[in-house]
């Protein structure tokens, strides 16, 4: 069985930490990866508008990605983090439904 890869988390991949030009120069941006959270998203509840939190899917898992993703703005607790949780939806493989 082939491996599937999801990369997610706070990557500081925006604003002062990484410009769009720097991000676009990364090989992972030019390859067969899907960046779920767009560059113009705001994943923090600070006064900045930065997409620090990212979800990146490899080509194999991208085929199961429904296109639905979001930022859970209801879950904000600054004692834990200054970031909102990000989420995405995958289709369940039909072969796993018969088990």
Over which residues does each language-model region extend?
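Metal-dependent phosphoester-hydrolase catalytic domains
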Residues: 1-6, 13-99
């Amino acid at each position: 069985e082939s491996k599937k890869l999801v990369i997610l988390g706070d990557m500081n991949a925006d604003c002062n930490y990484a410009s769009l030009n720097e991000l676009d120069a990364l090989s992972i941006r030019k390859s067969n990866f899907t960046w779920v959270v767009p560059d113009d998203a705001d994943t923090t509840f600070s006064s900045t508008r930065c997409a620090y939190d990212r979800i990146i899917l490899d080509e194999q898992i991208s085929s199961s990605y429904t296109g639905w993703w979001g930022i859970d703005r209801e879950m904000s607790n600054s004692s834990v983090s200054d970031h909102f949780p990000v989420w995405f939806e995958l289709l369940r493989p039909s072969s796993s439904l018969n088990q």
